[in-house]
Each structure stands twice: as structure tokens, then as C-alpha cells.
Amino acid sequence: MELNGAKILYTIHTDIPLLGDLKITQTLVSTWIVMALLSGFAIWLGRNLKLENVSKRQAAAEFIVERLDQFVHDNMGYHFDKYIPLIGAIFALSIGCNLISVIGLWSPTADLNTEAAWAIVVFVLIMYYKIKTNGILSYLKGLLDPIFIMAPINVLSEVSTPVSMAFRHFGNILSGTVISTLLYWALASLSHVIFGWLPGFLSQIQLFQIGIPAFTGLYFDWFGGCIQAFIFCTLTTIFIKRAAGEE
């Protein structure tokens, strides 16, 4: 039994300093596939919108937008409407990256680089609002509170926000993958113990691997994936709102 990371599918050799060669990985390919599918789905939902006699498709689109608006307003207030597209994009991309494994593709959220990229975006926004609200000098002075020797701990506290967000999401998704894999191999061993004494091809029957792993996979990919997307977006709204204060 092996648990491997994303494979490198192709390498583009470059002479760019520091950047080095560009590696096309399973994570990158799957992420672009998810983005293409989400873009196509959004375009399909937004076609031929009407003010009256709306279709079920338009009603579904309006429901999604209304729920997203309410989610952001409840967590951040009405002064942060400009972040509704960002929160919606992160939520949709997180769910899409989790569910893509259902059709046999590599899940980008099983790669820490994916969550780290999202967390860095959130961290930049947090730093922007802290500096905008307090001023850069006041922000730097705050890192020295209550005494200057606390500066390293305060800096570590700032950096821990994106790190904890990334590892929380990644860890939960990875744990689901590990549990599903262990269950699959445990059921294979159980099938071998029960049917291994039968003659011929009957001894190769993997009865217990049929159905049960699929249900556990659906739980971790669908339910667990949606929960993690919700938690990540909730933390995003809370941290940005806290950094912005009462803007």
C-alpha cells in the first residue's frame, strides 16, 4: 500500500533565475479542469436571465447568489460586498477540487500547495487591512507590544494565521484520503481471508471492496469536502473583518 503525492506530468525547462523549471503536476492539471468546469457551469447558469417568468436554472442561480450574499453579510457586514465574489470563488473551487476525485482525477486539495495559495491570498488581505486601518508605523509598533522582546512571538502569531488555515484544510482532506485507502486495503484482506480458500478464480473475489469504499469516499469527498470549504471561507471572512475593524 502506498500513498503518493501529485505526480509531475511534464517539465518545462526555463532559464528564469530563482524560478527554475516549470513543473506541470497533477495538481495543476486538475485545478485547471475544475476551474474550466466551474466557469462553464457559471456561464450556463447566467445565460438568458429574465425579470419575469424565470426558469428553474435562473432560480437556482439566484438562490446560490442570495445564500452567498447572506453568508458574507452575516459574517462581515454590508460594507464588504466587494469580497462576495472572492468568498464564492474560494468556496466553489474548494468544493470542486474535493469532488473531482469522484471521477478518478487527482484532488488538488490533497496537495498542500493548493491550500497554501488560498491562505496566502487571505493573509495578504489581512495585512492590507491591518496596515490600512492602523497605519504601517502603528502596525509595526504593535508587533513590539507589550515589550520589544515579544516581537518574534508576535510575528510568529501573524504568520500562524495562513499556516493554520492551510494545514487545517489540508489535514482534514488528507486524513479522509488515508482512512479511505486503509479501509479499502482492510476490506481486501477480509475478502482474501473469507474467500481465499475457494478454488480457482473464486479465491480472487473482492466482494467487500464493492460498494463500501464508494460510500466512505462519498462521505469524505462530498460531506467532508463541503464542511472544510465552509470552515475555510468562514475563517476568511472572520479574519478579514477583524483586521478591518469597523471600516
Predicted feature descriptions by range:
Residues M1-E247:
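Selective transmembrane helix interface/packing segments
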